[in-house]
Amino acid sequence: YTDVDEWMDSGIEAAFVHVATAAHESVIRSLLERGIAVYVDKPISDNLAEVKQLIDLADSKGLLLTAGFNRRFAPMIRRLKEIPDKNMLFIRKGRINLVEPVRQAVYDLFLHIGDAALYLLDEEVLSVQSKIIEKDGNLKRIWVELETKTASCFVSMNYEAGANQEVMEIQSPEGIVRVVDLTDMTTSDQAGTHLTGFGDWEGTLRKRGFEPLIRGFIEGIMKKENPVTTDSAYLSHSLCEKILQDNGY
């Protein structure tokens, strides 16, 4: 197809949206209004009011609107989720000399690790503290502290880290478990330190959570079950907006 409207009207039942964030709202709305289920690469929109409107539209039509939060489906992160009695969580993302306006950086990149934090926490977040460091309107660093009744979670992102790396660490009375770049797990406890990885033939899409998420979306269309509930997706977008508002953006 050379015309997007012709494509939308061709009888498709679902669509994967991978366009610039600025175009998300109009493209998603057009698809939903035609009765087409949508999988969208994060974010749904960088405008929280638009996120709510699109979620309400999807729900009113009984359609899936699935945000592409692949970390929830990465096997190693699912193992972190299963750890009982978590009391301290550290999530950090580093990038090499990345230059992005603050709002774009928070919604396009921080959103993923913010969502991972909310996914890994087992209770309602009671308080949020945050700090954004920027220069000339571009993000330098950001840190966020989330508190639940029984756990503290620290989330940070550094655009001048000197290395591209993502680390998630869970601490509990049983030990410390750390996952680097979604694939390499280190467990430290009273018995020592243990390394866990994937086999040589394990596919990258599965290791990073994309394969199970996409399968969940396709199966969810038939079952009417969203692998990423719209309530949880909205909560993650709301966290980003709160951070921006609290820091004057």
Q: What spans do the regions from the language model cover?
A:
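Mid-domain beta-loop-alpha active-site segment that forms a flexible
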Residues: 68-75, 96-125, 213, 233
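C-terminal helix-rich "cap/oligomerization" subdomain common to oxidoreductases
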Residues: 14-19, 63, 216-249
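Beta-loop-alpha module in the N-terminal Rossmann-like domain of NAD(P)-dependent dehydrogenases
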Residues: 1-39, 43-55
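Hydrophobic residues in well-ordered beta-strands that form the structural core
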Residues: 40, 65-67, 179
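A short glycine-threonine-serine/GTX helix/turn-capping micro-motif
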Residues: 101-107, 200-208
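A contiguous active-site-proximal alpha/beta segment in oxidoreductase catalytic domains
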Residues: 22, 45-100
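Contiguous beta-strand/loop segments that form the cofactor/metal-binding neighborhood of enzyme cores
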Residues: 111-184, 211-224
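Short, Asp-centered acidic motifs that coordinate Mg2+ and/or phosphate
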Residues: 13-14, 88, 152
